[in-house]
Design a protein with these regions (language model features):
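N-terminal segment of the mature folded domain
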Residues: 282-360
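Short helices/loops that flank or line small-molecule/ion binding pockets
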Residues: 297-311, 401-417, 425
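Flexible glycine/proline-rich
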Residues: 117-262
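Periplasmic-binding protein-like
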Residues: 332-343, 432-461, 480
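A ligand-binding cleft/hinge motif common to bilobed small-molecule-binding domains
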Residues: 312-328, 409-438
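N-terminal small/polar loop signature for handling phosphorylated ligands or for N-terminal nucleophile
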Residues: 60-122
Length: 480
């Protein structure tokens, strides 16, 4: 046989057919897939954001994923949470396409209407509403007069994992394509990953080279952690009945790309925007730099295990009244970095914070039940400062624990929180109010055994260079 059923037709196959005098062959038509986003709060990328609005991430991602898997994607825009308007748009989409994919409106709240509309669009209607996946539980699957209708969860990571796990196999079958074959590697998990029994859980990971093979660091959990996709190399799956994946487990990692490139320089520890300034010359030189923000304490633990080159830290020792040096273990040495100001961040004009000291501002926030905070992840030096200020108090928002200063500022700027703690350069960049608390030492614990590696030397040179110091100063840091 020249070509078998199911073969993907490319330039090579077309040439073979032409050589045999064959001008036409029957092929599977690319299924037409309509994509609708739902929600009053959605704004298309490129448009300005108003308070309480967010960019429509899912529409863009789902459209691209459909194309990658053999479909002809037709993005029809975002529809408000208005039931008659949404029903009209869904009927029109189903009339002209082979499949309809929506995002949002699948939960059972008063404002989520997509799943209610499906019942009127054709039989048999909804076949599954809610699946044992995390993230992705609210997924809704339906068939309306022979056409698949899928309502993905509104949170981006939930939407993408459920799309690839549940929808891609059906879409590729409709397109006449073979099942997706993702590259996989085995890696060791350096930290315990807690899970929730009863649902299979997907956890995104970043891969680094350890002394005995690949190490897979969790790079962010949560339904809305879209930035984690940019940092992750792939994901692992925790079984439905498991309540954890213990540290040291050898796990199978499904890669997002066909190949993984192990980074030349690995930085694990505290987050700081100054890192981007220092590592920019390395990236321009073609080096792959991986920075994993897990906090100062987590970074120190990684450095002791030999899983990184540098661990950025900012830990104050009350006994010696010094930063960082007392926390070093054998095999680590301190590299001075820069000074940065930590403080309370808030929206300008908020009278609960404007003109106050840090202590008075925190008291005012705790006295107002409507005042919502945004915290930082456990193990972060910033989290230690926050907990010292709060004492035993656990205000609303305390368990919202992003991994970066940028995420804290974004939560406040977008009215998802009223206050948090971040560094002055990030507050300035977001045009937010700022109450200084303390200038801290942001330094690096260097793994001595890796000191002579070319990428390590390049980082040290960039840190000490006049250009690097000038860039840090201009951004609001004070080089050591």
């Amino acid at each position: 046989a020249l070509l078998r059923a199911g073969a993907v037709i490319g330039s090579r196959e077309i040439g073979m057919l032409a050589a045999c005098g064959i001008a036409e062959i029957p092929v599977a038509r690319r299924p037409r897939v309509a994509v609708l986003s739902t929600g009053d709060e959605l704004v298309q990328p490129g448009q300005p954001l108003r308070p309480a609005e967010i960019y429509d991430t899912n529409g863009t991602i789902v459209t691209a994923a459909i194309t990658e898997n053999g479909g002809e994607a037709r993005f029809l825009g975002a529809i408000p949470d208005d039931e008659p308007q949404l029903e009209s748009a869904m009927r029109e989409a189903l009339a002209d396409n082979d499949m309809l994919v929506l995002s949002g409106g699948t939960s059972k709240g008063a404002g989520d209407v997509s799943h209610r509309v499906i019942a009127r669009l054709g039989s048999p209607g909804i076949v599954a509403h809610g699946v044992a996946l995390k993230p992705g539980k609210p997924l809704c699957l339906a068939v309306c007069d022979g056409k698949p209708v899928i309502i993905l969860p509104g949170f981006p990571t939930s939407a993408m994992f459920t799309f690839h796990d549940m929808i891609v196999p059906v879409l590729r079958r409709m397109a006449g394509l073979p099942p997706r074959s993702d590259a996989k590697v085995t890696a060791k998990i350096p930290v315990r990953i807690a899970s929730e029994p009863g649902r299979a859980e997907f956890v995104m990971v970043s891969l680094v080279e350890g002394d005995a093979g690949l190490i897979a660091y969790p790079s962010g959990k949560g339904s809305g952690a879209i930035t984690s996709f940019a940092q992750a190399d792939g994901f692992l799956r925790i079984d439905t009945l498991a309540d954890q994946m213990p540290a040291g487990t050898e796990a199978e990692v499904t890669l997002f790309t066909p190949h993984v490139r192990v980074p030349d320089l690995v930085i694990v520890g505290s987050h700081c925007t100054g890192l981007d300034l220092v590592t920019a010359p390395l990236a321009r030189a073609g080096l792959v730099v991986r920075s994993i923000a897990i906090g100062s304490l987590g970074g120190l633990a990684a450095a002791k295990r030999g899983e990184c080159d540098f661990a950025p830290i900012h830990l104050f020792d009350e006994k010696t009244a010094t930063y960082n040096a007392p926390y070093l273990a054998d095999g680590l040495e301190l590299v001075p970095g820069w000074r940065r100001m930590q403080g309370i961040v808030f929206r300008k004009g908020d009278k609960r914070f404007e003109g106050m000291s840090v202590q008075d501002a925190v008291r005012a926030a705790l006295a107002d039940p409507a005042c919502i905070m945004v915290n930082r992840n456990q193990g972060a030096g910033t989290r230690i400062l926050i907990d010292r200020l709060l004492g035993e108090a656990r205000p609303d928002g305390y368990w919202n624990q992003p991994r970066s200063h940028n995420a804290v500022a974004a939560a406040v700027a977008q009215h998802r929180a009223d206050w948090g703690m971040t560094i002055a350069p990030v507050a300035d960049a977001a045009n937010l109010g700022f109450i200084p608390l303390a200038e801290e030492h942001y330094d690096f614990a260097l793994v001595t055994a890796r000191k002579q590696r070319a990428a390590v030397r390049a980082f040290l040179d960039a840190l000490a260079s006049p250009e690097g110091r000038a860039a840090l100063t201009q951004a609001g840091f004070r080089p050591a």
